[in-house]
Amino acid sequence: MKPFTQHTGLVCPLDRVNVDTDQIIPKQFLKSIKRTGFGPNLFDEWRYLDAGQPGQDNSKRPINSDFVLNLPRYRGASVLLARDNFGCGSSREHAAWALDEYGFRTVIAPSFADIFFNNSFKNGLLPLVLNKVEVDALFAQCQVTEGYTLTVDLAAQQVITPDGTTYAFQIDTFRKHCLLNGLDDIGLTLQYAEAIRAFEATHRIRQPWLFAPLR
């Protein structure tokens, strides 16, 4: 998992409440359990005018020119600004995978659905909570300022605007450690690889019958 320390990126404002996981990545694209291949179909039903299917050439599909991600001013955005209850609906880790693969490093919102919130941390995507007044202020600035960027400093737990305004945010200490060091569940386990090998060697000596071949 790629570490998250400090990130400065173009902001895309998604001004909708209760964005659910089926809207983030529609169900027909969930047949794969690989973590890749979902970015091109992020918000598929909003980005395109036709019904998307796995394996389609998206370059030949009619786009919804009014959807915010398709507006030229937001191309290349890596900070998603959202509204309340982002990521609600069914539990699908694919939603975090799709956002990450598209290029988003963080989603800023007043609140998140619990399962999406947890899945994001496990996949290197920072779900960042600010209060509604702060999010409203960011929406207002983003919508009137083309090329609006934000800096997210995870170590300092601050969001920094282009004019130097800062917004503090809270994050669990353990989750912060994992993001700063790029540690997913596998990475955390591998930190103890030597201790695990030592235990297995000792365990084999102390209880050899557990490792005897079956007859």
Swiss-Prot record:
GO terms for biological process: L-leucine biosynthetic process. Gene3D superfamilies: Aconitase, domain 4. Keywords: Amino-acid biosynthesis, Branched-chain amino acid biosynthesis, Leucine biosynthesis, Lyase. One of its GO terms (cellular component) is 3-isopropylmalate dehydratase complex. It catalyses: (2R,3S)-3-isopropylmalate = (2S)-2-isopropylmalate. Transmembrane segments: none annotated. Its EC number is 4.2.1.33. It is an enzyme of class 4 (lyase). One of its GO terms (molecular function) is 3-isopropylmalate dehydratase activity. Pathway: Amino-acid biosynthesis; L-leucine biosynthesis; L-leucine from 3-methyl-2-oxobutanoate: step 2/4. Catalyzes the isomerization between 2-isopropylmalate and 3-isopropylmalate, via the formation of 2-isopropylmaleate. Belongs to the LeuD family. LeuD type 1 subfamily. Heterodimer of LeuC and LeuD. This is 3-isopropylmalate dehydratase small subunit. It comes from Xylella fastidiosa (strain M12).
